[in-house]
Amino acid sequence: ASTKGPSVFPLAPCSRSTSESTAALGCLVKDYFPEPVTVSWNSGALTSGVHTFPAVLQSSGLYSLSSVVTVPSSSLGTKTYTCNVDHKPSNTKVDKRVESKYGPPCPSCPAPEFLGGPSVFLFPPKPKDTLMISRTPEVTCVVVDVSQEDPEVQFNWYVDGVEVHNAKTKPREEQFNSTYRVVSVLTVLHQDWLNGKEYKCKVSNKGLPSSIEKTISKAKGQPREPQVYTLPPSQEEMTKNQVSLTCLVKGFYPSDIAVEWESNGQPENNYKTTPPVLDSDGSFFLYSRLTVDKSRWQEGNVFSCSVMHEALHNHYTQKSLSLSLELQLEESCAEAQDGELDGLWTTITIFITLFLLSVCYSATVTFFKVKWIFSSVVDLKQTIVPDYRNMIRQGA
């Protein structure tokens, strides 16, 4: 999915009960990409009673989340509540005023409910679970905002259109806004998920006008193997107490991938990995940054970036870096440069030697040629000049 700003919808109770001292106001932030999005209330002035739920990745590839604030019922209609949404990747800022449109309070009015009733979300298995045979991949179906009046939820699961019955439904959990959250988990086979089988969760509840169906599967398309590069700390960062080791993973498809760090065989936990970002060629890339104490880096500890993806051989690869490896690389580069200079000087020396030999040879040949010509001229003069002394004697 390309960068997309969110749509923002205010959520408010449609009635007020005299038995309820508080009311819940909500803000639905829908259909945005990529993460993250920031939600505040009254420009950050209202923080008490605020709860923002984690973002949910929809089957469309876009994210949605909701934020709820609990306020005194008596303040509805007299105070203003505004939901402030900021999505920096798309440079989108939205301010939505949440207003409760209710009639006179009456004892028989039900407790405030969210508009639309229960919502259903379907989550894929974690990439690491689908790529390691020792782990168990699961597809998870989550139903939220289930009312106390109709708490029973029925789940039906289908794999490629065929109903299956091995899913497990967890006990419902009561939420802070007096609704229930119900979760059903379906265990799937590794190869079924990787081969693109389609999983459907069908949810039925009396609070719904009709059943809700959600479908999910692995992204279609030819898998592409990721390229992994590790980057040491910059020289500027070496002045600080902690340094950053970076792992660049690029060129992979689909976006399902797992990245972890370890050192000397032990896992490292102080790292952050960006969500996969769609590149111009249709593949994805991401960065993972591990933060370590500078002393550990200077001691020569080896740190490894481990990548798991379906297009890799055995679904796994690892790239390591350490100060000693970087020094060896620098020494190798220096030796290569020295070797290149040595070769250059050798070439120059040979050229100069050959040039001097050529000059000497040419000078020697020229010298002998000049000497020969000079000797020939002298001999010729001696032969041609007449002997005037004999001629005078003969005349006398």
Curated annotation (Swiss-Prot):
Keyword line: Adaptive immunity, Cell membrane, Disulfide bond, Glycoprotein, Immunity, Immunoglobulin, Immunoglobulin domain, Membrane, Secreted, Transmembrane, Transmembrane helix
Q: Which SMART domains match?
A: IGc1
Subunit relationships:
Immunoglobulins are composed of two identical heavy chains and two identical light chains; disulfide-linked.
Which CDD domains does the annotation name? Answer: IgC1_CH1_IgEG (cd21817), IgC1_CH3_IgAGD_CH4_IgAEM (cd05768)
PANTHER family attached here?
Answer: TAPASIN
Species, as recorded: Homo sapiens
Q: Which SUPFAM superfamilies match?
A: Immunoglobulin
Sequence ranges on the Extracellular membrane side: 1-347
Name any GO cellular component annotation. Answer: blood microparticle
> Where is the chain membrane-spanning?
348-368
For this entry, the protein name equals: Immunoglobulin heavy constant gamma 4
- Carbohydrate-modified residues are N177
The gene coding this protein: IGHG4
Chain residue ranges for the region called CH1: 1-98
Tell me the GO BP annotations in alphabetical order: adaptive immune response; antibacterial humoral response; B cell receptor signaling pathway; complement activation, classical pathway
Region: CH2, residue numbers: 111-220
Role this protein plays: Constant region of immunoglobulin heavy chains. Immunoglobulins, also known as antibodies, are membrane-bound or secreted glycoproteins produced by B lymphocytes. In the recognition phase of humoral immunity, the membrane-bound immunoglobulins serve as receptors which, upon binding of a specific antigen, trigger the clonal expansion and differentiation of B lymphocytes into immunoglobulins-secreting plasma cells. Secreted immunoglobulins mediate the effector phase of humoral immunity, which results in the elimination of bound antigens.
Q: Which cysteines are joined by disulfide bonds?
A: C27-C83, C141-C201, C247-C305
Chain intervals for the UniProt region annotation (CH3): 221-327
- Ig-like domain residues are 6-99, 118-217, 226-322
